[in-house]
Amino acid sequence: MNRPRVLLADDNEQLLERVAEHLASSFDVAGIAHDGQDLISKALRLVPDVIVADITMPVLTGIEALRRLQGTGLASRFVFLTVHREDEFLQACFEEGAVGYVVKSHMNPDLIPAIHSALAGKLFVSPCLSTGSSTHAPKSRS
């Protein structure tokens, strides 16, 4: 059985190396992007199963990259790996169709379960986040 393919996107090279190393035992890291435009190009070329991206990147944000990928026919699931804990970022990601939201400081316990959830079509939010009474549901992928 083929291992799921993951595309990583972040402008922090050291973090990308740590994430790739963390995922190597469970997933095939198909590629690495360093900004939002690079993310779009590589996603369309590599067609990964899951994209793990930062929100704050040069050229285009991760949210804008996801927005632009919508409607291209790309079926990749999107998981954000970010420092942002604010509810408005979480909401914006899910409104654009993301299925996962992981806080960078909780990457080790949360990222692999988030990717597995994404592959199963399920929503994942780092448990350290308190979403109050908000309900965050991913956008329909019809």
Predicted regions and their residues:
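Acidic catalytic/metal-coordinating carboxylates
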Residues: 35-38, 61-64
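Two-component/phosphorelay signaling modules centered on CheY-like receiver
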Residues: 13-31
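Short, flexible helix-to-coil linker/hinge segments that flank and couple to helix-turn-helix
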Residues: 88-95, 99-142
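Active-site residues of response regulator receiver
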Residues: 54, 82
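Conserved sequence signature across two-component system core domains
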Residues: 9-10, 33, 51
